[in-house]
């Protein structure tokens, strides 16, 4: 059985912690990196870095030898980083980093912060230069003063030369050498200087003109330098000794050092006629001569006196010394350098002033009568203006019983704003190591590192429940010989004096500092601001005790004894629990509930008794804060159901774990509820479970709608906070903005600070705008922004584990106004790429502008000029002004159908550029009122356009808006739907009418009159209809309601009769039914079938063969039908009024005069077939003698009877009745053609009728042969079918 190793591990951990703390406390501070000098333009940011060891070392900063106040405007200090947000003249100078711990303090070398400048070119005295062809040419340039060194460029014949080429060599001095002059090199040359920090480019106002001449002689000339030069160069830097020599042929050039040839293999090398080295050494100092000669023995030379400068160095530094009290100490520091460096002595980062006990002689320091105050760190700093070097040494006193404490670094008084984060530091040394305590106006400050400072107002004390003894707790971090007092959110109650006391067994020492707290509105620190008044009042009320921070409302009782014994608990391995780890996502799918799920952090050695959860609503739209709601959850639970929340709202949650050791660090979360659902769905929601019922913490993977937040894995916890929401930007002043954000989950550790970064558009670097922003502030003011520039901002949250991810960058924000760094006018103008007339009074144009064409010179905007093309007067030009960020413009108030000239310029404070290309565009023709309006081409607005009045932007565009487009589409669709509805209604009405017709007059049904034994048909030709008084014998439809002049009988007739027009013999076609059609038309599928007028078709009943002789009256219209499934019936034949089809098989129809003829039906009818020729010669052609074909027809019918025999029956009084069923498959017809009988057989699906040509009847025979069926008076009107006249 293994023994319990828990106590052993705890004891080992505590021992190692004590040893490490002791070792760290005995280590002297030293720098691992020191700040470097920087050059920046005014208004630009500067960042200095410094780091030191051991980890207990604290870093502060000095400016020009004085302690730098971290609350200065435009200055931010965070650990070892110093950030100057906006450089101004008061912040120029040298900066030093100061590192201190319990052993002592040391100071770094100075880092100079200077402003970048670029001077102006001086006047040039020589404007025309002559160079010989095939020789060397030299263009001198007096480079203006610049910090840092300017880059030299040349503009040669209008083209820029930035780097050396094969024929052009830009020398380090800024001069230009032409290696081999030719005639092509003549022209103008201008020198320019470019500052890489300010990005300024200055060109000399008057350049030089190069003339190329023929070689005149073989003389040798040294064009540069013209006289000897003294040159001081820095050790280990590149050097070029220039020597430009001309002559034809090219002279020989060689170099001497101190009168001797330069040995080959040295650091020097030849560069054309120059002498160069990449790294010069101190041994390279001396005199260098450039010798040039030709074949004729002409020699010329020039001399350089080179002095190599060396950085300050220390060959022998300080040594640590341990002496007894009252002894004498000597420190020696051997320094070297060119020029000779000066040596400065420091004790604990403070300059040592000569005194009776402190003497400086040469490079040594002598201290007489050492006392306790002399212990600490000593420094020797060597500086010769080229560089610096320092050496440190420690002075200790022998351990002969120890000595009283000495405060090495005292706390510094500060003036801060309400709500700021304040840190007071104090370091002391002594033997044994002293214990440091803090006091305020109320006495000793007792605290625990895990607790935060809270208000001490009597109101808050009285508002607490009885028995709750909650002492004000400060956040104090103490180590051996060092202590820091932190106040996370300072208030007016914290103002006053604070005393740092260091004590050991030999005595005590004190140092004090004053803390002044001012309201934020009068704060001189301009970078940090509070939220709106509502948020400030809320924070102040919390500080007053109604809702005092996170822990003030928790039922916590902190006894002084527990606070005093806190270090012992830490020593025994017991501490307060860590912050809970929240697993819930930052959003919920329900509008009024949220499940908060977490898991416990480290319990600190004691079980967690309870969790305290506080939540409130955040109105992220206006920055309003709701009131806190506090819930206590048993320590065994890991889930809390929050109910009665507001939909679509942002909530903030703070929770801590409590054990017997106290409350741990708070965990923070922000979540958003979903949108409100419908009333029906909301009523069906399950009721909220009671608080305290444990649940399994399950996070649905389907929750993908996280509002842009990246969820961390719930199975692990990174510790760093989540990225804040995207910040919002609002205007504070002309050159400053407010950056406001909303934090999210703190990752299990409280957020200690925020950091805001900014980026100027068209640059790639993010810079720090503000850091060390207290967590109580969710807004910051960023100042000194450049007018006219566009910026983006992002926010970072910081806690004990580190920095969060960067938030999403804000939307671009453009600072109003124009930059103040315009130095010259732009040269090249924009290019108009496109013009279009969008209406009769407006023209739209687009252009492109390339900043690099003007050396990236900023512009303020564009001038757009336009005038009618037919005008030659420049005063007719009108001008529109457009912002520099625009890429298109709409010119308005133009004349219709007029051509315009359009040109542009870009401008800034320096002036206007050259004109762009000229475009000609003509406006459209003015529309006539009431004319159709054609849609105008849609104009897309560029993303960066910000319509700002005038005719710029989409507000004045003539293109249809989306609302007008929707209106047009809606109207078109409405008209289409209306047309469709009318069409459907017409189809339904027509279908209903057809159904009505088919109901009474089925197409394939032949009506059989029960009382009909025969029929009379009046046949009227179209041409003869008017011969009988313009009238017909009776009406066609209803009681003569259709006059003879009505000639359109309209109905569908497919090649034959397809329907029967209803009616009765007594005013209609058949009795018992009235006509429902006021106008009945007959349509023909083949309109050309109506030939030579119309005709009447009728069903001809088949007669017995014995009576075929009486069929002669039928002439050519005898027709034999075979009807399948027919039966004999006594019913009379049907009456069928039809229209003549197109003549087929030789059948021809002839128009007849209006006559009344009998239909040959029985043998009892007298023979009226022989008619006088003169009676019919005007109407009908003579009919040849016929012989009956009825027998053949009957035989044909009988022969086909096996297949589908037709049945015939003889009716009463000799009537032959033919009954035709609904489906007729075969019809056989026989017609006379001359003396022969032609048979035709046609297979159809409906009854087929042929024209019945009736012969004329004499007047005497007409009345005798008139037949009337029983029950019908003879004076009844006869039904007549009048055919349409064909045109």
UniProtKB/Swiss-Prot annotation:
SUPFAM superfamilies: Fibronectin type III, Immunoglobulin
Extracellular side: 26-963
Post-translational modification: N-glycosylated.
UniProt-annotated location(s): Cell membrane
Domain Ig-like C2-type: from-to ranges: 29-114, 120-204, 225-303, 310-396, 405-516
Membrane topology listed for this record: Single-pass membrane protein
Cytoplasmic side: 985-1287
Fibronectin type-III domain span: 579-677, 723-821, 826-926
CDD domains the record matches: FN3, Ig
Disulfide-bonded cysteines: 50-97, 141-191, 243-290, 333-380, 426-500
Any single GO CC term annotated in Swiss-Prot or TrEMBL for this entry: plasma membrane
Glycosylation sites (chain numbering): 88, 100, 180, 287, 294, 342, 427, 570, 873
SMART domains, alphabetized: FN3, IG, IGc2
GO biological process, one term: positive regulation of neuron differentiation
Feature: compositional bias, Basic and acidic residues: 537-546
Signal peptide start-end: 1-25
Iron-sulfur listed as a keyword: no
InterPro entries the UniProt entry points to: FN3_dom (IPR003961), FN3_sf (IPR036116), Ig-like_dom (IPR007110), Ig-like_dom_sf (IPR036179), Ig-like_fold (IPR013783), Ig_I-set (IPR013098), Ig_sub (IPR003599), Ig_sub2 (IPR003598)
Region (Disordered): 531-553, 933-955, 1268-1287
UniProt keywords, alphabetically: Cell membrane, Disease variant, Disulfide bond, Glycoprotein, Holoprosencephaly, Immunoglobulin domain, Membrane, Repeat, Signal, Transmembrane, Transmembrane helix
Listed Pfam families: fn3 (PF00041), I-set (PF07679), Ig_3 (PF13927)
Subunit structure: Part of a complex that contains BOC, CDON, NEO1, cadherins and CTNNB1. Interacts with NTN3. Interacts with PTCH1. Interacts with GAS1. Interacts with DHH, IHH and SHH.
Related illness: Holoprosencephaly 11: A structural anomaly of the brain, in which the developing forebrain fails to correctly separate into right and left hemispheres. Holoprosencephaly is genetically heterogeneous and associated with several distinct facies and phenotypic variability.
Function field: Component of a cell-surface receptor complex that mediates cell-cell interactions between muscle precursor cells. Promotes differentiation of myogenic cells.
Protein name: Cell adhesion molecule-related/down-regulated by oncogenes
Organism name: Homo sapiens (Human)
Gene name tied to this protein: CDON
